[in-house]
Every structure is written in structure tokens, then in C-alpha cells.
């Protein structure tokens, strides 16, 4: 399985680590740490040297309770960073956005992947993504970032996320986005309680019936902190456990804050799966 974008190829026969680069003042874990161009490029360099093959640049926090930012502000935060990374590093670039204007400008700046927590539901986003021809990560979220964690409820969380993927794939194909351009993200922590999150993690491998890449992000999230009763800065161990469990089930892209540690964990996963004949655990 491979992804093609902007003349580049991403081989998905092994797990890739996607390093998180939040250029925001209010992200839940690292808000404000990298929201200048110099600091953002410096952190991107650290992640690339640590083994990240994808850098995910986001200019709007999607933490629970987060407020939206204007198009102009998000463009000002994201585009200079995307351009700088594209010019300096041999790495795939993902843009974490829901806005059509940012999608178009990010594609021009050198982005390879659109990572949209709202699955192209904002007006004009679907059309913008289709125009760029870039791969798109479709994420499941119940509600919106401002209210999603107030009282998430499902009759069957796996069935509902699965149904959502079916609907979104069909919607994208109708708009002219080829199925092979899509990635699927169950949306850990987005409108889900502890039980919902671990049910999805336990059954993650079942989503391979779509024959599409799986992107997962559990790094430093509440599903780790609540279980272990620790704050964001003390969630590395739990985050690594989640990453390994996901990769052993065949998740191709692991989105994380702690790149070096996750890259090393993925080497262990790869060695184990190789010894098993490259068959994932289900």
C-alpha cells in the first residue's frame, strides 16, 4: 500500500511516525511552545532527525473546548511554517486544517496530506480537497471540539464509526476524490469516553476491511491520562503502549508528540511483525 502526492511516494508497508507540530498558543499539550517560525522549524528539525517521516502542522487547536480561529490567522500561522519545512527537509508534510482556504494554500506551499478532524464537512472543504488532488485523512468526531466531550454516547461505537467511514468514503468519491487517496482515523478522544476509546483501540484492526491506511492519534490524550491518573507531560508510557497496540494491528501512521521514543517502539513492532511473516495481530 502506498500514498502518492506532490510527486512523492509514501510506502505504507511499515508504520510511519507523524510528528505533531502545533503552531498554536492553546493546544492541550504543547500550546505556545512552537508558535514562532524559528521555534517551529527548530522543532521540525528535531523530529525529522529523530525519525519522523511525516510532520503534521496545525494552526488551530482542536482540544476539548477549543474556540475556532479566523481564516487569516490560521493562514498566517501555518503557511510560513509549511514553506520553511518544504524548503529545508526531506519529509512528508501534513496540514491539520478544516478550512478550504488553508487547504488550497497549504497544497501550494508543499503539503502532501490533508488531515481534517471535520472530514471535509466545512463549506467548500470537500471541493478544495478534490481540487488539490492530495490524500485526505477522514476522522470521526461526535459533535465539535467545543462540546464533543460533554456527554459522548453511542449504542455501538465501533458500528457507528464504521458506518461513518462508509458514508464519508462515498461522499468523497462522489466529489471526485479517488478512494485510494483516503486515510481513516477513528478519532480517539474526539467525542468519546474512556470505554469508547479503548473499544476502538481493541478493534482497530477490523477497519482494515476498507483496504485504506489507518492514521491514529492517541499521544498524551485523556484516554491515557484518565486511565493512569497523570497529566499531559507524564503520559509518555501510556502513549507508547497505545502506539504499539495500534501498530501491531496494522495502523500505518502513528501521530505523536514524542517522536524518538515512538520511532524506537515502531522498530520493535516491525521486527516482531517481520518474525510473524509481516502479518498484523487482530
Name these PLM-found stretches.
Residues 1-2:
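Extended, charged alpha/beta regions that create polyanion-binding interfaces
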Residues 5-6, 12, 29-38, 42-43, ...:
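Active-site-adjacent loop and "lid" segments of alpha/beta metabolic enzymes
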Residues 42-58:
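Catalytic domains of carbohydrate-active enzymes, especially glycoside hydrolases
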Residues 178-181:
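Short acidic capping loops at alpha-helix termini that bridge into adjacent secondary structure
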Amino acid at each position: 500500500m502506498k500514498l502518492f502526492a506532490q510527486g512523492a511516494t509514501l510506502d505504507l508497508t511499515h508504520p510511519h511516525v507523524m510528528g505533531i507540530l502545533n503552531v498554536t498558543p492553546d493546544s492541550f499539550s504543547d500550546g505556545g511552545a512552537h508558535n514562532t517560525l524559528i521555534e517551529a522549524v527548530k522543532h521540525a528539525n528535531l523530529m525529522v532527525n529523530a525519525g519522523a517521516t511525516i510532520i503534521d502542522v496545525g494552526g488551530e487547536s482542536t482540544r476539548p473546548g477549543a474556540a475556532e480561529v479566523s481564516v487569516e490567522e490560521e493562514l498566517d500561522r501555518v503557511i510560513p511554517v509549511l514553506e520553511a519545512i518544504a524548503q529545508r527537509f526531506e519529509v512528508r508534510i501534513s496540514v491539520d486544517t478544516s478550512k478550504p482556504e488553508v487547504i488550497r494554500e497549504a497544497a501550494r506551499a508543499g503539503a502532501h496530506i490533508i488531515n481534517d478532524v471535520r472530514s471535509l464537512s466545512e463549506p467548500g472543504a470537500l471541493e478544495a480537497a478534490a481540487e488539490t488532488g492530495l490524500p485526505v485523512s477522514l476522522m470521526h468526531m461526535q459533535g465539535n471540539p467545543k462540546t464533543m466531550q460533554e456527554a459522548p454516547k453511542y449504542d455501538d461505537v465501533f458500528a457507528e464509526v464504521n458506518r461513518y467511514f462508509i458514508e464519508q468514503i462515498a461522499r468523497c468519491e462522489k466529489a471526485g476524490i479517488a478512494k485510494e487517496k483516503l486515510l481513516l482515523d477513528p478519532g480517539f478522544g474526539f467525542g468519546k469516553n474512556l470505554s469508547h476509546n479503548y473499544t476502538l483501540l481493541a478493534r482497530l484492526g477490523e477497519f482494515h476491511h476498507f483496504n485504506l491506511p489507518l492514521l491514529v492519534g492517541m499521544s498524551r490524550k485523556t484516554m491515557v491520562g484518565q486511565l493512569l491518573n497523570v497529566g499531559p507531560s507524564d503520559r509518555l508510557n501510556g502513549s507508547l503502549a497505545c502506539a504499539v497496540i495500534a501498530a501491531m494491528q496494522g495502523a500505518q501512521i502513528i501521530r505523536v508528540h514524542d517522536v524518538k521514543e515512538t520511532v524506537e517502539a515502531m522498530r520493535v513492532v516491525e521486527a516482531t511483525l517481520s518474525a510473524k511473516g509481516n502479518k498484523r495481530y487482530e
